[in-house]
Amino acid sequence: MKVFVYLLVTFSLTNASPLRNRFNEDHDEFSKDDMARESFDTEEMYNAFLNRRDSSESQLEDHLLSHAKPLYDDFFPKDTSPDDDEDSYWLESRNDDGYDLAKRKRGYDDEEAYDDFDEVDDRADDEGARDVDESDFEEDDKLPAEEESKNDMDEETFEDEPEEDKEEAREEFAEDERADEREDDDADFDFNDEEDEDEVDNKAESDIFTPEDFAGVSDEAMDNFRDDNEEEYADESDDEAEEDSEETADDFEDDPEDESDETFRDEVEDESEENYQDDTEEGSEIKQNDETEEQPEKKFDADKEHEDAPEPLKEKLSDESKARAEDESDKSEDAAKEIKEPEDAVEDFEDGAKVSEDEAELLDDEAELSDDEAELSKDEAEQSSDEAEKSEDKAEKSEDEAELSEDEAKQSEDEAEKAEDAAGKESNDEGKKREDEAVKSKGIARDESEFAKAKKSNLALKRDENRPLAKGLRESAAHLRDFPSEKKSKDAAQGNIENELDYFKRNAFADSKDAEPYEFDK
């Protein structure tokens, strides 16, 4: 493909200007331009031919360049690298080095300290001596003497105190240390700062959370983060609710009617037992001084208690038990329906698999159709190449015919000279008459000979002009034959080849003044 593009561009750039400047009026000798000029009846016709030819060549050059540029752009795409913006690099970079450097940059106190680090890093990269690591910045990372002494506190601090006081002091000291660390982390991570907020958003997008990422994040920042991701947490709670409903459905599926009866029976027993306890307590208060009299033990019977209840209370209890039983029955039916849903999902999955198989078969049919179209295009390209070769052979045959006509003109000129010699031997009157006729015929023969030469030169010139383009057409056809899968480029090139072949069929052997201008499809 690159070779084909190079040939097209080279032909258009190297042959266009010589074709335009072919005719040189200042040339002293009898040139092809003079012969071509004499083949026209008037100067206006000759100038019209020149203008038309220059216009056709310009159109040809534009046509070739318009076809070559898209191919060039395909092979050499434009650079689409992002802008080297420092802020966007620190915030949006996803490679390991960039992300580590972003965290390292946040650890410096001010911009000057980081610039010092950046300068050392760049110098090490330029010299290629070694990699920059954390040991290069030990001096910057050193803590003040007070904090070092605070961190180096050991058992000697508590030697003079009792053991319990030592333990309490250690716990207070550890709590103070953790509080100081949290304050430092909160001070480093300001959620109102745009850079830290963008950092959290970028990490949320890439899903790279670790416990260390939220070590210094304040409670307010975490609440805002949960609000932003409320939908995700809602989805998780919905999944948990579905699991609970499935477990409840399994429990009710075992024996929902027994469950409802037992629940009702337990409630009635509890209520009856409470009434019974109240009665026994009242009786014991009345007869608490009578120690000899024994309290008869009551035997609780829920069914009898229910039968002995007043009529309105009996109806109320019956209605409540029916309502509970109906509710439990509805819940069990809903749970059973939810359990049956996986079977429907399996059927839907099988239907989707069948649809996918049908789509795959359809894609196979389309692929076979594309292969058939590619083979047909290949045959058409070969046919176009054969027609181009036939056109070139026909041009050579016309050139041979022109040479034959030139030989016939020379033969006529020789016969005229012989007639002139024979006329000199005859009488003066007849000789002069024949001499005039011979001179006239000689002039006619000379004119015919010059016209034949001009026609031959014009045909040779036209063949030279058409030969590179015919060669390009053959190469284009061969390219399409080798790469039939490039369908879009193939269709466009095939249409241009057909138009160009039609033009050459109509005008390849016509006289220059009768040739029609070459027009390309835009």
UniProtKB/Swiss-Prot annotation:
<feature type="signal peptide">
    <location>
        <begin position="1"/>
        <end position="16"/>
    </location>
</feature>
<feature type="compositionally biased region" description="Acidic residues">
    <location>
        <begin position="109"/>
        <end position="125"/>
    </location>
</feature>
<feature type="coiled-coil region">
    <location>
        <begin position="319"/>
        <end position="465"/>
    </location>
</feature>
<feature type="compositionally biased region" description="Acidic residues">
    <location>
        <begin position="358"/>
        <end position="374"/>
    </location>
</feature>
<feature type="compositionally biased region" description="Acidic residues">
    <location>
        <begin position="173"/>
        <end position="200"/>
    </location>
</feature>
<feature type="compositionally biased region" description="Basic and acidic residues">
    <location>
        <begin position="72"/>
        <end position="81"/>
    </location>
</feature>
<feature type="compositionally biased region" description="Basic and acidic residues">
    <location>
        <begin position="93"/>
        <end position="102"/>
    </location>
</feature>
<keyword id="KW-0732">Signal</keyword>
<feature type="compositionally biased region" description="Acidic residues">
    <location>
        <begin position="153"/>
        <end position="166"/>
    </location>
</feature>
<keyword id="KW-0175">Coiled coil</keyword>
<feature type="compositionally biased region" description="Basic and acidic residues">
    <location>
        <begin position="407"/>
        <end position="453"/>
    </location>
</feature>
<feature type="compositionally biased region" description="Basic and acidic residues">
    <location>
        <begin position="375"/>
        <end position="397"/>
    </location>
</feature>
<feature type="compositionally biased region" description="Basic and acidic residues">
    <location>
        <begin position="461"/>
        <end position="491"/>
    </location>
</feature>
<keyword id="KW-0964">Secreted</keyword>
<feature type="region of interest" description="Disordered">
    <location>
        <begin position="72"/>
        <end position="497"/>
    </location>
</feature>
<feature type="compositionally biased region" description="Basic and acidic residues">
    <location>
        <begin position="284"/>
        <end position="343"/>
    </location>
</feature>
<dbReference type="GO" id="GO:0005576">
    <property type="term" value="C:extracellular region"/>
</dbReference>
<feature type="compositionally biased region" description="Acidic residues">
    <location>
        <begin position="228"/>
        <end position="261"/>
    </location>
</feature>
<protein>
    <recommendedName>
        <fullName>Aspartic and glutamic acid-rich protein</fullName>
    </recommendedName>
</protein>
<feature type="compositionally biased region" description="Acidic residues">
    <location>
        <begin position="267"/>
        <end position="283"/>
    </location>
</feature>
<feature type="compositionally biased region" description="Basic and acidic residues">
    <location>
        <begin position="142"/>
        <end position="152"/>
    </location>
</feature>
